[in-house]
């Protein structure tokens, strides 16, 4: 493979970040998408809660001779959760645009550090563009990990904390469920406020707290309408795909041994629960 330097990429950068870490250019639905982590980005330019954000811009065309993306969109949040970083995207031989994220932020201490282990990889996600937004959905192959299917009801106890949960949430209603829940309902709180139009993810009551200086709560606006959520849990990881990947919340948690239940505190979500084979252990 031969490389030729054309020049610095022109993507209408605001130049407030001191480092553009892990930049990658991928083509999604024939449009150039730049995904990167601007360390030190001025929050007056783009608000973010994590120590460093993972953002993207979408262009209409890529001028290879002049290394220019034109016209280019505003900055967008790639993931609304706590720990996504250094997302790497690529175009597969079959034409799909795929990406995988690092779940673990630099310069943040995690409970697993004492075991000389930090970070984990996300699910592999397929990318598409709808209405000027980048959608992310788990690749189809993940479904091979499903062991069975069970109707989701108001309480599931003693899970393995390794499962997929597909939910339908009625609009004009507030739904709250708790993953990694103990018997008293303390765990990872997910609130879908489909009256006022807001999603709230709160990890303050699940296991060992960490990175609290960057808050234990994340929020994002959502249309107050019927909503779907596809949730993946794997022991210390959660990935939540809302409305077919329009919005994603991902993060790490370190639950106590008794936090293995799923509780519903408000609303009446319906759906399907799939116990999964472990993502990380050979079958």
Model segments located where?
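Short glycine-/Asp-/Thr-/Trp-enriched loop segments that recur within the blades
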Residues: 14-20, 80-83
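Hydrophobic core segments of beta-strands in well-ordered, beta-rich domains
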Residues: 5-8, 22-26, 31-44, 97-103, ...
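A generic structural signal for short coil/turn motifs at secondary-structure boundaries
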Residues: 43-46, 250
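Beta-propeller blade termini and top-face loops
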Residues: 46-47, 58
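Short loop/turn motifs that cap or connect beta-strands within the blades
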Residues: 8-12, 75-77
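Short beta-strand segments and strand-loop junctions that repeat across beta-rich extracellular domains
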Residues: 1-2
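Beta-rich accessory regions
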Residues: 52-283
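Short glycine-biased active-site loop of nucleotidyltransferases that positions the nucleotide triphosphate
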Residues: 17, 47-48
